[in-house]
Amino acid sequence: MKKQLIIGTRSSPLALWQAEFTKAELSKHYPDMEITLKLVKTTGDVLLDSPLSKIGDMGLFTKDIEKHLLAREIDLAVHSLKDVPTSTPEGLIITSFTEREDTRDVIISKGGVKLKDLPPNARMATSSLRRMSQLLSVRPDLDIRDIRGNLNTRFQKFDDGEFDAMMLAYAGVYRLNFSDRISEILPHDMMLPAVGQGALGIETRVDDEQTREIVRILNHSTTEYCCRAERALLRHLQGGCQIPIGAYATFSNGTLKLLAFVGSVDGKTALRNEITKTGLTSPEQAEEAGIALAEELLKQGADAILSQIRKTC
């Protein structure tokens, strides 16, 4: 058994929370192990002037950490699973999916105003095409403004009056103790989350069996089934850039239910579908369900929506 572990992480407040959480959870099971953090600056932390939709977000927050992992400078990497591309580099694997936090998105607004009550043409900040598409489908008048930077930076921009409202993931807001700023938590029938939202993905080298065995103890089986189904759906649909896709799976007593959304950026076209599979006994079967739902969405016309978006990537 290893006596030391080095965790690779970004240096943003949320990333540090995630790494410290992982360290603390591992220490509960391995109290004598020395666990340290190595901070890595990623491309996504540096390129803050352009919208994610223009530069693409495939691995922007993970590739640089993965280089350290492949170079054996760290033993594991802790990511927000929603930032992890659905195909990991050769030699690396997502070994553990931590128990998921609430997957919903939230509205932060002046005076606690809810989405439906925001004034006409309100300035709404989000960097996500997924959120933009679903927002515009219910509030086509909104003036969508791009926002980048860590959570603290976004709250500062909001407090400085740059926007009337902004949309964030509940998980990050809760983890950094900003819950008292939430104006509204949006239900899944209005806003499906990003694939893997709310979960952490712990990445290791495939050939590092000792580390894989150590961190596997943090794996949450239900979360793994759900996230592997969602990631399989996204992998089957995606073509290498940020696109408006949302998904949310639940799993209980062998039954997986997966909801998914594909929409146009302007919110005028939205496809939703769902699938339920029973008797599942392996995460691989959950992935098969994700692929099956992706195929149904393609039959509905998702391919036409996605090909149009990819032309602008």
Curated annotation (Swiss-Prot):
Q: Which reaction does it catalyse?
A: 4 porphobilinogen + H2O = hydroxymethylbilane + 4 NH4(+)
Tell me the pathway: Porphyrin-containing compound metabolism; protoporphyrin-IX biosynthesis; coproporphyrinogen-III from 5-aminolevulinate: step 2/4; Porphyrin-containing compound metabolism; chlorophyll biosynthesis
Q: Does the keyword Transferase apply?
A: yes
Q: Which residues form a coiled coil?
A: none
- The keyword Metal-binding appears for this protein: no
Molecular function GO terms recorded:
hydroxymethylbilane synthase activity
Provide the GO biological process annotations. chlorophyll biosynthetic process; protoporphyrinogen IX biosynthetic process
This enzyme's EC code(s): 2.5.1.61
Q: What does the record note about the cofactor? A: Binds 1 dipyrromethane group covalently.
Q: What does it do? A: Tetrapolymerization of the monopyrrole PBG into the hydroxymethylbilane pre-uroporphyrinogen in several discrete steps.
HAMAP family hit by this protein = Porphobil_deam
NCBIfam families, sorted: hemC
Additional comments on file? Answer: The porphobilinogen subunits are added to the dipyrromethane group.
**What is the protein name stated in its UniProt record?**
Porphobilinogen deaminase
Gene for this chain? hemC
